[in-house]
């Protein structure tokens, strides 16, 4: 989960200042709304020409706490912030290329019919694919040196809505004819999955001199991996329009996978898994549910993995205070008075989230996100401590605490790299904070996507893993929501004992695991938000064991 350093509305008060929330908010908003007032335009299109004052009055159905919070927000927003309507996320400049090795037309795939076991004809794959095309480029491994394996890159095109999602596929280093396929998703919302590729689990990393450094613990050691930049306008992806909620992005991902496996049936017969971290705790339940909803599909989905995710905010936000105040296994970051303030803020935060859960309205969900993020994330950020790793300070404010993100961006902005991958945009950025704010102001942040998990558990196994040094999506909250989830196997899961996780023939454990039915939770020691980066060997171990079915219900 990425928090914009430029907007206090996301809880990102300046780490360099200990001033009060209101003073910081006024300063940040005054500086930023002149150049990016589109980031906080009214969330509903029908109110695009109104001011905060007028659209507030239109929603008498809001509860008193939500109304009060909108009043507070209005005091912080400059009067000219809504002078004219603008798009949330600015379209990226892009130039279409013609040098593709394959173009798969969704309309052609949609026309394919097969005869079922009952003798009746039905479409080979379900879903609406007519408007989608998939473009594929064979990447020459020798040009970039990221890996020696077979690679493909390209775009999924939604021609009707002018959306173009970039992907990069790496074949397994081991046995690609039989090894599973994994889709990897980073979060944000609005952050490129190429971060996961080069910072965490891909075949190579990028050093300070922009050199490619091989990763011996890459997740494609025993699986083929697809890295996807989504939603649109993230990383190398682009559009003239915007995606502002998780559900809309799910249709795109289903189309991409369907067309990819149609073009490459040699990978379609293998087991397929979706893995991701952070805001992918929102994405993955929706994407998996979308795939499973299609009876006729060529996607052999076998499990999902969510690492340090945001999935059930009502339960998870309760655990920011314990994690920041010394109850998560690491020393306290906040003072006793700050911890008491967080305790005092919890009832209001939970009331706002419950109202969001019940109504689903942006007018309830936006205040919940704004209030709770400022009360529970803001105080921590003001200390200068890394929100993604409680063990140290933020080393680079301009690159989400990690200088390596800047190196990755510089590498991916090189012309020879973009040409080798068939990139159509003018440049790359690791995170698009317009998208981040867009999702916030569409009410997506606090939505109860955990409610989809019981339905997924009926079909396939689910793994929740969490590095225990992360603050932003900490292990306490992830363990708590997995135990609070209402599903038929709840009692058995909660009674299951935590067992040691360790490498084969190793005496030292690297975490704990509990599993029952199709549900598994892991706590990974000495790892922050990005577990594969901090514990590369251990993360590859539990990945391979998970893909091998060690904790699957028999």
Swiss-Prot record:
Protein family according to the UniProt entry: Belongs to the peptidase S10 family.
KW RNA-binding (keyword) present: no
Carbohydrate-modified residues are 222, 518
What is the active site of this protein?
278, 470, 529
Q: Which gene encodes it?
A: cpyA
| Location in or out of the cell | Vacuole
> What does it do?
Vacuolar carboxypeptidase involved in degradation of small peptides. Digests preferentially peptides containing an aliphatic or hydrophobic residue in P1' position, as well as methionine, leucine or phenylalanine in P1 position of ester substrate.
The superkingdom of the source organism is Eukaryota
Cysteine-cysteine disulfides: 191-431, 325-339, 349-372, 356-365, 394-401
The name this protein goes by in its record: Carboxypeptidase Y homolog A
Q: Which reaction does it catalyse?
A: Release of a C-terminal amino acid with broad specificity
Q: What is its EC number?
A: 3.4.16.5
Mention one GO biological process in which this protein takes part, according to its record.
Answer: proteolysis
Which residues comprise the propeptide? 18-137
| Matching Pfam families | Carbpep_Y_N, Peptidase_S10
User: GO terms for molecular function, please?
Assistant: serine-type carboxypeptidase activity
**Keywords from the UniProt entry:** Carboxypeptidase, Disulfide bond, Glycoprotein, Hydrolase, Protease, Signal, Vacuole, Zymogen
**So which residues are the signal peptide here?**
1-17
What is the organism field in this record?
Neurospora crassa (strain ATCC 24698 / 74-OR23-1A / CBS 708.71 / DSM 1257 / FGSC 987)
- List the GO cellular component terms: fungal-type vacuole
Q: Where's it mainly located?
A: other
